[in-house]
Amino acid sequence: MQNGSVLSEVLAQPGATDSVFDVLAASVRSFSQGDRVGILGFAGGGVIAPLRALGGGHRLSGVDLDHAGYELFCDLSAGWMGAVQFAQSDAVEWLHSQRGKFDLLLEDLSVGRNGDVFKPDVSIDTLPRLIQSKLKPSGVTVFNLLPGDDRTWAEMTAKICAPFGFGVQVLFESYYNRVLVLGNEALPPAREVSRLLRAELTAIGSEMAADISVRSLRLGKR
């Protein structure tokens, strides 16, 4: 953890992390209508243990500039990780190169500086429109939003949401992170999203079931 934000967590077996990763996994499980999921910012694959515990059999493709986290993940998770592909690459270059469209893209990039962790500029200025172009019509993206270096929450949220017509945000009592769930087609109301996520989190015994609140995002419908 840095600056109140969890960067990665690797478990030796499927199960809850009792952290933001459980909510990311529950979001993938709840909103991916197919099984093709991309992870931008793989790190140690922290989302995969709770996702597999939830019964999510998605085909996962991850990208990260650093290979070390993936190696650790494989050492601990080879017996149960399921279909996982990894590329050591720049996230924008990798996503540009991908053929076909994704059911869900999870954006989990971060950059560390002086002991703190921030959202990189590319996550706010470049990736939202690229991600939108790489999603199926019914596809959804999940952004793990961290504090900005020199941007407000409102500015970051507005820029990330701009290409999308529908969305909700998940807030935490215990973490600075905010999770944005965005799509081109209508999502359930915030109250229903809260119920869906809490049900998934409760199913794996995650403490996050009592830690989250879900709010609507007012977006310009496309």
Q: Can you name each region flagged by the protein language model?
A:
Residues 1-2, 22:
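S-adenosyl-L-methionine
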Residues 4-8, 110-116, 141:
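A short, flexible beta-alpha/helix-coil linker loop
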Residues 5-14, 28-30, 177-222:
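SAM/dcSAM-binding transferase cores
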Residues 15-137, 149-157, 175:
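The AdoMet/dcAdoMet-binding core of the Class I SAM-like
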Residues 57-59, 81-83, 138, 164-165, ...:
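A generic structural signal for alpha->beta connector loops
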Residues 138-145:
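Conserved beta-strand signature within the Rossmann-like core of class I S-adenosyl-L-methionine
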Residues 142, 164-175:
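Conserved S-adenosyl-L-methionine
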